[in-house]
Amino acid sequence: MYDNCSEADREQGKKLLLQAQEVAAKADVTLQTQNRLATNLSNGILHASKENDASEIIVGLHIRATQDESFFGPVLLNLLNKMDRQIMILHAVTPINRVHNIHVAIPENAEYEAGFYRWTERIARMGENTGRRIFYHGHAKTLSLIQAYLQRYHTSVLYEMQETDGGNELKRLSTELQLDDLMV
C-alpha cells in the first residue's frame, strides 16, 4: 500500500487478504498474506517476497486509464522485470464457484520453465476441487507432458487436450469463451 492510504483503505485491504486466504484454502493452497506500507508499491512487493521467501506472487490485472498506458500497468511491469518468482496475474470477473469451464492457454516450450509442474499442479487442484472440466490449449509436446502428469497424480480431473498452432489461438479462444469460463 502507499503511505497516503487512509485507515479505511488499510482495513479494506486486510479484509480482501482474508477473503483471498479463504479462497486459497478451498483449493488446498496455503496462502500467506502480508499487509505492509511502502512508498513504492512494486518495491514493497519485491522486498516482502524476498523477506518471506515467497514462491508465488498473485497480483490483480491493472485496467488502463489511457491508451498510452501499458496493458499491465507500471507496477506489474516493474515486477515482471525485477522478480525471479512465479507471478500470477488475476482479473476475476466471475466468482470461482460460478465458473463453468477452465481454459488454459499454454505458450510454446512452457515445459522448460522452472514453474511448469507447479502451475500444472495448481490448475489440476482447481479442477478437482471445483469439479469443472479443464481445456488445455497448447503444443503437442507440452500437452503430452501435462496429460502424463494428470494421469499419474490427478486421475479424477476432467480434462481435454486441444492442440494449437500458438499464434492466433488466444484470439480464437477470446471469441469462444463465455462469461462463466475461466481463462488461465
Predicted regions and their residues:
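Well-ordered alpha-helical segments embedded in enzymatic catalytic cores
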Residues: Q19, G44, R118-R122
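Residue-identity detector for glutamine
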Residues: Q12, Q19-Q21, Q32-Q34, Q67, ...
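Soluble or luminal CAZymes and related metallo-dependent hydrolases
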Residues: Q12, L16, G115, D165
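Soluble catalytic regions of membrane-associated enzymes that act on cell-envelope
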Residues: Y2-S42, S49-N52, E56-A65, G73
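Structural beta-alpha unit
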Residues: A25-I57, T155-V184
